Amino acid sequence: MGNSYGLWPLVVINSLIFIIFAFSFTKPKTSWDWRSFGAFSAFLVALFTEMYGFPLTIYLFSGWLSAKFPGIDLFSHNSGHLFEDLFGWGGDPHFGPFHILSYIFVGYGFILLSNAWKVLYAARRDNTLATSGPYAKIRHPQYVGFILIMFGFLLQWPTILTLAMFPLLVWMYVRLARSEEENAQKEFGGEWDAYVKQTPAFIPKLKPKIAN
């Protein structure tokens, strides 16, 4: 595999950088916070393990990939950007369409986490319901932020493990969101019910058309 893999210090460094970065935005406190953050951290470790440590996905599909792309060095680092290979991007994969899209999703996901945390922290401090900022558009921007980041990394470097983990983590976040909503309803009652009627859970509403 040459010098492209077996770079375990990079696995550790990159995992820590993104985990600490996410931690600085989310600052988990409740058990729900820690569960969502722990699952997200596991996804990042699995991702960077294949990106820099051992390319399990490429190894398992090496026969098929070699037949389909006979001129590609499968175990070079650039070949790990599988979507760029599969869709015939001939240039540097770091500037390919999927990689650029991944930057957008990952970047926006972290911005959403940061903005959501500021509102949520203030609401918890004052024992009020978070309804401003990102919470004015959707009820669970923190989970949407995690999902956007994971989806962005999947576009950049898809692996068997992360592709399998992604739907499970989305399902877990939906369950955590429902548990949080049950507690919020008990705590805030009618205020929460009114908020739910006006604000979707995960996907923001399109702006209504202005009548003539």
What do these predicted ranges mean?
Residues 1-131, 149-183, 187-212:
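Membrane-anchoring alpha-helices and their flanking helix-loop junctions
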